[in-house]
């Protein structure tokens, strides 16, 4: 998760010592393999055993098979989510206490996402230090007018309702600020920040020929349309495949390069086969970040067709690389993407227009250059991750100093 990685690195760059407590298994995937962290991290990692998680994953998988479209029925989903919240709270809290027992003294507890919020609060009160909750988006904005939202979606609401000294919510287009306001979160302890962009330390200099040598399925003689996202249903990669089918019908040589992996991979490959797209789709799987930058600097078009929000790190990076965008009209990007200024936009489910826009950018060099220049201008308004984290670290240091002063007076 790039934003988590950059946050941790930013805290270390600010001169602070970190002890990261993680569940031994990824609670959000069905994979039963233990998590592994690459060596050489600038922080220490302690794993909470969470021996209950492998069995929980099996139960959740079985529950999913009971629903339609491979989704867990609502009542079962509610029970599973609440159980996971409470079980993670116990596991993470006990693990944090063991970390303390081993000699680590914390001046602040930072909980990443709603499932860690309650544990972060409990640990901070045990240790008498401030606590911060960090949320990476929400789906609650359109549900807030309905009754009993916090009861119907307790885990999603927990990030806002569990007490914290500072609540940081990503400005990712999911309108977390509206949710915070409706839950009565004080503006004094709420921060709504857009993620930063971390360009490569040196500009990518890989040519198309070199990328073809690295990724053999690439065709250097076609236009390249790039997608960078996890292959989840709400990312709607199927819309891109439908748009690519329009290109094929109009005999426009274009390859869709899909950088990313996820649970929808098999379904998407089946759809591509049904649409007779053949080698027009290149499934790269997970790709190193430096290679993403190289692809962005050699591709012709960036495709983004999400359902929930299209305001995301890959969009910022595409702007930084000057890559023209073909996307869907979306209120979350209304201030970033302007039709025929730096992007071509269609209605969400208008595959024909989406495809026509892809065809147009593949064929019109002048339009592509115009949109590229506008993208580079837009990128000048973005924070780098270094700038974004300097602001956050300053806030955290202020919080710690205020807590220390209060303790001295007490």
PLM region descriptions:
Residues 1-49, 104, 404-409:
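N-terminal subdomain of nucleotide-sugar transferases
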Residues 5-9, 93, 97-100, 139, ...:
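Membrane-proximal helix-turn-helix segments that form the acceptor-binding/catalytic region
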Residues 160-201:
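A short, active-site helix/loop in glycosyltransferases that binds the activated sugar's phosphate group
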Residues 168, 217-235, 241-244:
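Conserved donor-binding/catalytic core segment of Leloir-type glycosyltransferases
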Residues 286-287, 294-299:
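Short alpha-helical donor nucleotide-sugar binding micro-motif in glycosyltransferases
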Residues 307:
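Aromatic "clamp/platform" in nucleotide-sugar-dependent glycosyltransferases that forms part
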Residues 324-327:
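Short hydrophobic beta-strand element within catalytic cores of glycosyltransferases
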Residues 339-340, 344-351, 360-365:
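Conserved acidic donor-binding segment of nucleotide-sugar-dependent glycosyltransferases
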């Amino acid at each position: 998760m790039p934003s988590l990685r950059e946050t941790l690195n930013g805290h270390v760059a600010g001169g602070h010592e970190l002890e990261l407590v993680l569940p031994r298994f990824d609670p959000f995937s069905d994979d039963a393999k233990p998590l592994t962290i690459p060596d050489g991290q600038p922080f220490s990692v302690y794993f909470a055993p969470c021996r209950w998680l492998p069995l929980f994953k099996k139960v959740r998988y079985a529950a999913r098979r009971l629903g339609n479209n491979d989704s867990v029925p609502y009542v079962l989903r509610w029970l599973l989510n609440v159980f996971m919240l409470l079980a993670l709270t116990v596991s993470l809290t006990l693990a944090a206490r063991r970390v303390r027992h081993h000699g680590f003294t914390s001046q602040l507890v930072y909980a990443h996402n709603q499932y860690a919020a309650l544990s972060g609060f409990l640990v901070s009160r045990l240790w008498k230090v401030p606590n911060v909750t960090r949320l990476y988006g929400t789906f609650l904005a359109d549900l807030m007018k309905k009754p009993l939202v916090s009861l119907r979606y307790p885990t999603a609401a927990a990030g806002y309702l569990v007490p914290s000294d500072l609540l940081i919510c990503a400005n990712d287009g999911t309108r977390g600020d509206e949710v915070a306001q409706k839950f009565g979160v004080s503006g004094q302890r709420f921060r709504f920040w857009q993620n930063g962009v971390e360009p490569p330390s040196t500009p990518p200099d890989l040519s198309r020929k070199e990328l073809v040598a690295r990724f053999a399925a690439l065709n250097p003689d076609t236009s390249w349309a790039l997608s960078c996202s996890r292959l989840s249903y709400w990312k709607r990669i199927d819309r891109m495949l439908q748009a690519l089918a329009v290109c094929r019908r109009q005999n426009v040589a274009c390859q869709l390069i899909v950088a990313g992996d996820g649970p929808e991979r098999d379904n998407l490959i089946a759809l591509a086969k049904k649409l007779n797209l053949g080698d027009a789709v290149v499934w790269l799987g997970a790709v190193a970040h430096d290679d993403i930058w190289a692809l962005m600097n050699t591709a012709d078009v960036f495709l983004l067709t999400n359902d929930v929000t299209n305001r995301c790190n890959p969009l910022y990076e595409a702007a930084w690389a000057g890559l023209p965008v073909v996307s869907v009209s979306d209120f979350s990007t209304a201030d970033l993407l302007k039709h025929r200024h730096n992007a071509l936009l269609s209605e969400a489910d208008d595959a024909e227009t989406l495809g026509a826009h892809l065809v147009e950018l593949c064929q019109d060099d002048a339009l592509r250059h115009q949109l590229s220049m506008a993208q580079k201008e837009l990128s000048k308004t973005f924070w780098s991750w270094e700038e974004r984290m300097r602001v956050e670290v300053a806030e955290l240091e202020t919080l710690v100093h205020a807590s220390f002063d209060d303790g001295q007076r007490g």
